[in-house]
């Protein structure tokens, strides 16, 4: 049987908390000084710094780069972490693994198109792989990377990333499907990462592929299902390359013809 409190079943008033028992309070019951909160945030930042530093070592073993490219990537990552606080550029859970999850995953595309100097990255978002590709080609004569992004804040970040890394990138603020035809000059390779299902990506990239571009699309473990779906709309002969950085795959296409 439930016990009833005094005054017609109302529960008694809660006892006052003991001094210092409130969240953020010191032993005298006062709020913890701001300096303590700042020190805690600084400690968290230092911890994340050391995790990212170790992740960088692992990533550069998977995908080695020159010292000049490494320096550019360092500036890019520093900028991304700064902007991440106000603009969601990457999933927060992936921050400790920026180098292996995002940088190395992007760098492996270069080896699949070693002669490509002119790239198009559709739906660049936080710059993967577009900014990474641009960093690797900063000293390549005639190199350029077109980064197409529809969200203004992300496009602003991409422009700043290209500026501080002194990389050969051109940012287009536009809807993906509306802008591909406007890219001037030939494109050797078109890519898109975490943007849309494969059959839609082919639709975005087909105008460039028709002009001779190769397509490289990083995909996850469900690549076979995406290929099956894409084959309903497109005649394609895909090549699959296993990712170095996880269980995913990279779909390579040299041509695509829409089914009647």
Swiss-Prot record:
UniProt-listed CDD domains: AdoMet_MTases
Record field: compositional bias (Low complexity): 9-20
Segments of this protein annotated with the region Disordered: 1-45
Localization per Swiss-Prot or TrEMBL: Cytoplasm
Polar residues composition bias: residue spans: 33-45
EC number: 2.1.1.170
Alphabetized Gene3D superfamilies for the sequence: Vaccinia Virus protein VP39 (3.40.50.150)
GO cellular component: cytosol
InterPro entries associated with the record: rRNA_ssu_MeTfrase_G (IPR003682), SAM-dependent_MTases_sf (IPR029063)
Residues noted as binding S-adenosyl-L-methionine in the record, renumbered to the chain: 123, 128, 193
Chief site of localization: cytoplasm
Bilayer-crossing regions: none
Keywords: Cytoplasm, Methyltransferase, rRNA processing, S-adenosyl-L-methionine, Transferase
Family matches, as Pfam families: GidB (PF02527)
UniProt xrefs under SUPFAM superfamilies: S-adenosyl-L-methionine-dependent methyltransferases
Catalyzed reactions: guanosine(527) in 16S rRNA + S-adenosyl-L-methionine = N(7)-methylguanosine(527) in 16S rRNA + S-adenosyl-L-homocysteine
Organism domain of life: Bacteria
Gene Ontology MF term list: rRNA (guanine-N7-)-methyltransferase activity
Known function: Specifically methylates the N7 position of guanine in position 527 of 16S rRNA.
Matching HAMAP family: 16SrRNA_methyltr_G
Family of this protein: Belongs to the methyltransferase superfamily. RNA methyltransferase RsmG family.
Protein name in the entry: Ribosomal RNA small subunit methyltransferase G
């Amino acid at each position: 049987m439930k016990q009833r409190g005094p005054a017609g079943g109302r529960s008694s008033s809660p006892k006052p908390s003991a001094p210092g028992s409130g969240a953020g309070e010191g032993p005298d019951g006062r709020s913890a000084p701001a300096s303590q909160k700042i020190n805690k945030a600084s400690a968290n930042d230092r911890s994340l710094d050391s995790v990212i530093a170790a992740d960088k070592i692992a990533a550069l073993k998977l995908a080695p780069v020159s010292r000049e490219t490494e320096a550019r990537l360092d500036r890019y990552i520093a900028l991304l972490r700064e902007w991440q606080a106000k603009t969601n550029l990457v999933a927060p859970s992936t921050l400790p693994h920026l180098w292996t999850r995002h940088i190395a995953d992007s760098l492996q595309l270069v080896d699949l198109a070693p002669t490509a100097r002119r790239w198009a990255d559709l739906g660049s978002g936080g710059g993967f792989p577009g900014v990474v590709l641009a960093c690797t080609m900063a000293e390549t004569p005639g190199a350029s990377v077109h980064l197409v992004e529809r969200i203004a804040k992300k496009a602003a970040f991409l422009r700043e990333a290209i500026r501080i890394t002194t990389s050969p990138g051109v940012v287009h603020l536009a809807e993906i499907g509306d802008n591909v035809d406007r890219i001037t000059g030939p494109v050797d390779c078109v890519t898109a990462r975490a943007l849309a299902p494969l059959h839609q990506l082919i639709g975005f990239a087909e105008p460039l592929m028709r002009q001779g571009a190769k397509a490289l699309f990083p995909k996850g473990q469900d690549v076979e299902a995406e290929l099956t779906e894409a084959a309903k709309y497109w005649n394609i002969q895909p090549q699959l390359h296993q990712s170095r950085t996880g269980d995913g795959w990279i779909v390579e296409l040299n041509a695509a013809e829409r089914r009647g």
